[in-house]
Each structure stands twice: as C-alpha cells, then as structure tokens.
C-alpha cells in the first residue's frame, strides 16, 4: 500500500518512517479523544456506587487509549481520502510522516491493550463494551457505513455514544436505563453536529465520494434533518430530570441549552441553499460541541453539588 498526495509518493509500507511522538499522538485523534474521555468520566461520576480512584483512573486511561486506537485504525483505512480532503490532508499518514502499516500495528496493539487491561483491572462488561465500540467505529462505520450510505453518521454515531455507558459500567458492572439515556443524548446529538460540518465541507466529501447527506439528498433535506435531530437531542437531554437521576435545576439548564441548540439549527434551516459562507452551519457546529460539554458538565455538577455541600457543612 502506498500513500499518495498531490506531490507524489510520500510513504510506503515496509519502510520505517521517521515519525515523532507528536505524529503518533495525532493518530489518536486527540480532539475526539478529549470528548470521549470527558463523557466517559461523566459516566463514572454519575453512576451510583463507588470506584477506587486508582481503578477509576485506569478505567479512564483505558477508554482514552481505546478511543485513540480506533482513531488510528480509522486514519489507516481512510488515508486515501484523507490525502484529498483539505481538512485532513496534513494528517500523519497522507502527509507521509507515518507509514500505513505502522499506523495499523499501532492501532491494533493499543486496541488489544486497552480492552485487556480494562477487563483485568475493572470488569469485563466495561471491557466488552469498549471492544465492541472499537470494532463498531473501525470496522462497521469506517470500513462499511462511511462510504456506502448517507445514514453513515446516524448509525455510526453509536460508536461515539458508548463512552458514558462504559464509564457507568466500570462502576456498576451493569447497563441501566440511566446509562442508556446518556448514550442516547450523544447518539441523537451526532447527526446535527456532523451534518452541520458536512454542509460547509460538501465539496471535500464530494471529491472523495463519501455519500454525506448534503451531497446525496441536498441541502434542504439535510437542514430539515438537522432541526429534527436538534429537537430530539434537546428533549432527550431533559430526560434525566424526569427519570429522577437529576434535579429540576439540571432540567432547566438542559432545557435552556436545548432551546439555543434548536434556535441555531433553525438558523441553518433558514440559510439559503447554495450559501457559500455557511455561517449559520459553522456556528451550529461550534455551538454543538459546547452544548454537549455543557449538558454533561451540568449533569456532573448536579450529581456532585449535594456531596460537596454536605462536606462543606462539616467544616463549619
């Protein structure tokens, strides 16, 4: 296998690259990994019960490594299209800094390591969900869904939604309705988030033949779908209050954040077809990231606030 960009042959299998530690770190998709770590940590915090801090730290590290491993496998498989798309052309493999075979080996080793250590140190249910998540993202999404259906993000979004469920399972050794709701918040959030990106990166996706919804169904259909998923996400995000594992205060915060999320999605819906600047889509993409962090932060604050207040009361 050979990686080629506009300047010719950049890296070949069988040749040792001169990659730096930073290049290998970039293979892990650190921005995506940070969101995975954050939501997994939220699952740990929100779960009833207790986990030893050392085991909790090991769990988070294993989840982070597993997420990074799936990112490396994704970059290995997608090197051909990454070399063409402007936002991915400088990734380590298409840029020639890491050979594809090295990236594959790196991803496989980290995958096995993260799953085995999580199983041995914490429990095998959480390790099993982590293994399934890696497989789903690297194989089901990357190798099949991404290039075959405009619903790639809808179905494939499950991979990014599992981390809080894994964190929850690390503490409880179970999958519950509460952890399923945490899963659903991210699962329903994903289409609006990524289709906003797909709108202002339509040409990139068209150039590499990835059937993102805007390229297949058009801007108008995509905008309707974005609004629909924003509404579903906002509704799902207030469910913890109704199900009793978050307070009314959290519910009000989630409702306010959801209203802004829906407002931003409606701004995208109102955007004229063919708009070259795509400013509403870019704003929605940016806010959607803040929204998810804010919702899970609010959940954790809601969970920890009574504990912190009770401890503070003991100091006076």
From Swiss-Prot:
Catalytic activity as recorded in UniProt: heme b + (2E,6E)-farnesyl diphosphate + H2O = Fe(II)-heme o + diphosphate
This protein's UniProt keywords: Cell inner membrane, Cell membrane, Heme biosynthesis, Membrane, Transferase, Transmembrane, Transmembrane helix
Primary localization class, coarse: membrane
This protein's encoding gene: ctaB
Disulfide pairings: none
Name listed for the protein in its UniProt record: Protoheme IX farnesyltransferase
Cellular component, GO, one term: plasma membrane
Miscellaneous notes: Carbon 2 of the heme B porphyrin ring is defined according to the Fischer nomenclature.
EC number: 2.5.1.141
Any single GO BP term: heme O biosynthetic process
InterPro entries: Protohaem_IX_farnesylTrfase, UbiA_prenyltransferase, UbiA_prenylTrfase_CS, UbiA_sf
Family classification: Belongs to the UbiA prenyltransferase family. Protoheme IX farnesyltransferase subfamily.
MF GO annotations: protoheme IX farnesyltransferase activity
Source organism superkingdom: Bacteria
Cell compartments where the protein resides: Cell inner membrane
Enzyme class: transferase
Membrane topology note: Multi-pass membrane protein
Pathway: Porphyrin-containing compound metabolism; heme O biosynthesis; heme O from protoheme: step 1/1
Membrane-spanning residues: 32-52, 53-73, 93-113, 116-136, 152-172, 180-200, 221-241, 252-271, 289-309
Function: Converts heme B (protoheme IX) to heme O by substitution of the vinyl group on carbon 2 of heme B porphyrin ring with a hydroxyethyl farnesyl side group.
């Amino acid at each position: 296998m050979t990686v080629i960009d506009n300047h010719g042959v950049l890296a070949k299998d069988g040749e040792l690259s001169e990659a730096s530690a930073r290049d290998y770190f970039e293979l892990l998709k650190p921005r995506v990994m940070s969101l995975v770590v954050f939501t997994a940590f939220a699952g740990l915090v929100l779960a009833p019960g207790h986990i030893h801090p050392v085991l909790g730290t090991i769990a988070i590290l294993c989840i982070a490594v597993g997420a990074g491993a799936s990112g490396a496998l994704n970059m290995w498989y997608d090197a051909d299209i990454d070399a063409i798309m402007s936002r991915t052309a400088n990734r380590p493999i298409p840029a020639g800094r890491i050979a594809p075979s090295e990236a594959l080996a790196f991803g496989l080793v980290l995958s096995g390591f993260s799953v085995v250590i999580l199983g041995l140190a914490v429990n095998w249910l959480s390790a099993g969900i982590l293994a399934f998540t890696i497989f789903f993202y690297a194989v089901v999404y990357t190798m099949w869904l991404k290039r075959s259906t405009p619903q790639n993000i809808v179905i494939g979004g499950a991979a990014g939604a599992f981390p809080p469920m894994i964190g929850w399972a690390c503490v409880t050794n179970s999958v519950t309705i509460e952890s399923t709701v945490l899963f659903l918040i991210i699962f329903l959030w994903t289409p609006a988030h990524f289709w906003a990106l797909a709108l202002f990166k339509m040409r990139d996706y068209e150039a590499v033949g990835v059937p993102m919804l805007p390229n297949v169904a058009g801007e108008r259909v995509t905008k309707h779908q974005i609004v629909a998923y924003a509404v579903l996400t906002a509704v799902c995000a207030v469910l913890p209050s109704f199900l009793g594992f978050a307070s009314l205060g959290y519910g009000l915060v989630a409702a306010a954040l959801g209203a802004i999320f829906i407002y931003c999605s409606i701004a995208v819906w109102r955007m004229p077809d063919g708009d070259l600047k795509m400013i509403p889509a870019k704003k929605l993409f940016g806010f959607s990231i803040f929204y998810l962090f804010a919702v899970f932060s609010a959940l954790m604050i809601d969970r920890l606030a009574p504990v912190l207040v009770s401890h503070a009361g003991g100091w006076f």
